Amino acid sequence: TLFAVTLAIMSFATNAQKANINNLPSQHSNSTNTTTTIHFTAEPISEAVFKRMQGKSYKANCTIPRTELRYIRVLHYGFDGKVKSGELVCHRDIAADLIEIFKELYKARYPIERIQLIDDYNADDETSMLHNNTSCFNYRRVAGSKKLSYHSRGKAIDINPLYNPCVKRRKDGSMTVEPKAGRAYTNRTKTFKYKIDHNDLAYQLFKKHGFTWGGDWRSLKDYQHFEKK
């Protein structure tokens, strides 16, 4: 009798293991969909996110309603080849564009060093660029101007800014470079990693979605910058 009971218990345990294995999610059929659902999302600005932004990217005089902004989560490949989690705040009008673009960049393993809210750098653009941070919304004026930047509307994004600086050339031949540490990457005839040009995938995807590239401007060259009107 004891032997029969033991066999019954062993049989039950084996069947339970089989049932648990059969109930595990398929790594091939569901993992990609789950990743897309969790990480490539656009949501209204939550209280927690807004607290991070207040007094930084979302300044006291900000004229852009919070309701027009969206919090985006993406995945991307870092310079070390590892998958990273990124976050952006943008205008709702370009949220779907950014989700689609970053999905394609992720599939292609396009390297982006980091994607953090600029609030992590106290909304200081120079510091954010120095750390090669890809960012979007920041209520501020164009450097050296009284005009509001497209970043103020959440309709512009800077990609790998250290390697793709903003370059302003003067008539006397001198130039201003933002970030300052990006001066080594102002000669765009050279070949180097992470350079955005017309052959670059990021350029091609943003253009496909109707964005303008700062590298095509005449008055200055903002190689990191994409905006959509």
Residue ranges and their predicted role:
Residues 14-15:
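Sec/Tat signal peptide C-region and signal peptidase I cleavage site
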Residues 18-82:
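N-terminal module-boundary/linker segments of secreted carbohydrate-active enzymes
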Residues 70-72, 133, 155:
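A generic secondary-structure signal marking the coil-to-beta-strand transition
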Residues 77, 97-111, 140, 162-165, ...:
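Structured segments of extracytoplasmic/periplasmic soluble domains
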Residues 125-152:
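Active-site-adjacent substructure of cysteine-protease-like catalytic cores
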Residues 142-144, 148, 154-229:
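Catalytic cores and adjacent binding grooves of peptidoglycan-active enzymes
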